[in-house]
Amino acid sequence: MALIHYVMFKVKTPGERPAVEQLFQEEYSQIQMELPKVQSVVILKNCVDRASNFDIMIKMKLADEDTLHAYLEHTIHRRLMKITGGLAEMVGGFDCWESELNPDC
């Protein structure tokens, strides 16, 4: 059963958003190549400018919970956390089983 992993990221400085988006595109593409059980990665940009919104959301489909742990411990993920840590105002995560998603939503 696939696990869906979400990461929400809000930049401290709006001008940094394009660079962070580009970094995520490049690095998550590499993660997907190095971890075959990462089935898909989608980087989404917020389209409504509200103070309470996050700027970027990453949606990952992972083969199982072991893949989540492998991703969290992966060198690229650890490096991204260091690089973006100072750029983040807020970061949030959420995990659910794919079977719990409502296809009509």
Show which residues each predicted segment covers.
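Short S/T/G/P-rich N-terminal loop/turn motif that feeds into the first structured element of a domain
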Residues: M1-D55, A63-E73, C96-C105
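Short, flexible helix/strand-to-coil boundary loops that buttress conserved ligand/catalytic motifs
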Residues: L72, M81-T84
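A cross-taxonomic marker for long C-terminal extensions/tails that follow the last structured domain
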Residues: I83-V91
